[in-house]
Design a protein with these regions (language model features):
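Nucleotide-activated sugar donor-binding and catalytic core shared by glycosyltransferases
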Residues: 1-184
Length: 184
């Protein structure tokens, strides 16, 4: 497990707001008690958790730290909410934002309002989910296509007479492509 500095503070805030809450670490040792909220205080489980939620808030995006990757909850076809600090995934964010597949909030109050609205208006949430799934479908295989294109470009570059003395990079790209495809 990782050391999450604010875990107990967040647990306290949730309880103060009237929610029953537990942590992922506690659930490893105790049976769940139908808690309203489970706080993740472990590493490597966020992707699995996205699959069971209805609405996903992408953390890190309410502060100038930069948000997490939208593609993780999108892979599960979720309604996504982000803060305004998505500069580290600006192209991906723009794609989802321009197609109304994610909502952007400025602060915690707006976040609460939008989460509530998505549950009060399930048809809006379902439209967002459909658009998210469409974006994922349309972009499936993009990494492989990019690697193939890069391989072709490098091959053409290295085949030109003025560049024949350079070390061939295309074998490295082929190796990378094989490795990367194994990951996705």
């Amino acid at each position: 497990t990782r050391r999450v500095l604010r875990t107990m503070e967040v647990v306290h805030l949730c309880r103060k707001a009237g929610f029953s809450v537990t942590t992922r670490t506690k659930l490893q040792n105790e049976a769940p008690q139908d808690e309203d909220i489970v706080i993740l205080d472990t590493i490597g489980e966020l992707g699995k958790i996205y699959s069971i939620g209805d609405v996903v808030f992408v953390g890190g995006s309410l502060v100038p730290h930069g948000g997490h990757n939208i593609l993780e909850p999108a892979a599960h076809g979720k309604a996504i909410i982000v803060g305004s600090h998505m500069f580290n995934f600006k192209d991906t964010y723009a794609l989802f934002k321009n197609r109304d597949a994610c909502l952007t909030v400025k602060n915690g109050a707006e976040l609460a309002t939008e989460v509530t609205r998505l549950f009060d208006e399930p048809e809006h949430r379902h439209r967002m989910e459909e658009e998210t799934r469409a974006i994922v479908r349309e972009n499936k295989g993009a990494s492989r296509k990019s690697a193939v294109l890069l391989h072709q470009m490098l091959d053409a570059y290295e085949s030109s007479p003025e560049n024949r003395h350079h070390v061939r990079s295309t074998q490295k790209i082929t190796n990378f492509q094989t490795y990367f495809i194994d990951l996705v």
